[in-house]
Amino acid sequence: MTAVIADAERRNPDRWLFLGDYITDCPYPHRTVEFLREFGRNRDCIFIRGNREDYMIAQRNFPQAWEYGSKTGALRYCFEDLTDGDLDWLAGMPISSRVEIPGCEPFMMCHGSPEKSNYLFHTDTLEAEQMTSRLDEYGVRLMLCGHSHIPFIFRRGDRLIVNPGALGMPVNGQTCAQYAVIDYDGEWHPEIISVEYDIERTAAEFAESGLLEKSAVWGRGLIGTIRTGVNYTVLAVRIVERLAAERGLPVTDESLWNEAAAELDIP
């Protein structure tokens, strides 16, 4: 995050737009929230929340039995590291916002879709065409979204949907942190930017923070992702669910996760 912000500051942006998923699956979530809150006090920022924030808010309101281990260890680590103040701040964010900035036409920002933080937008489906046509319902020609961790610029006529990618966990085969800059001169001009950062320093923090020990194969998969841009955790989940169904075992069984790690060659 700090590498991206340093790069973006050199471009002197008028407004900072944050699309959610600030926490979970990375070390030191409380530290991250503190940083963002302080940053927001000193910059012109708009924050919305993503599905990861929703997980933590739901856990406070309706606790589940998250245990350390590959299935839910990373979630428990995150929840235990956050304070009530952190959760209050995150809960105060909307899941979408129609933004009006002087000198620009309005636009939408969301994490998944304007209605669902966990909506997964695919650019090669009929839904993509339908979502683009729905921009008229919001009175905008531009929507910013996230969730997939895969950057894209989807254009149909004068309608645009832009996903800037991911700062911390890109899964498009790249290892740089990703964000977008959007200029307006009567038309929208988006640019997706990649920024190198110290991957091995970040990988070391998984162990230093305790996240790796508490999340087992999941944490190892996350480190593999930041090193390769491959979504190892999703691949592991698919294998574990298949093995669990075949063998009549719970998906929390660590032997299944270890088998998935071996199949995927997760170190």
Place the predicted regions along the sequence by residue.
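Core catalytic region of metal-dependent phosphoesterases/phosphodiesterases
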Residues: 1-84
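Glycine-rich phosphate-binding loop signature in dinucleotide/nucleotide-binding domains
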Residues: 8-12, 42, 101-103, 136-139
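Active-site neighborhood of phospho(di)ester-bond hydrolases with catalytic His/Asp-centered motifs
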Residues: 16-21, 46-51, 110, 142-149, ...
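Active-site-proximal segments of metal-dependent phosphoesterases and phosphodiesterases across multiple
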Residues: 65-69, 105-137
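Metallo-beta-lactamase
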Residues: 70-106
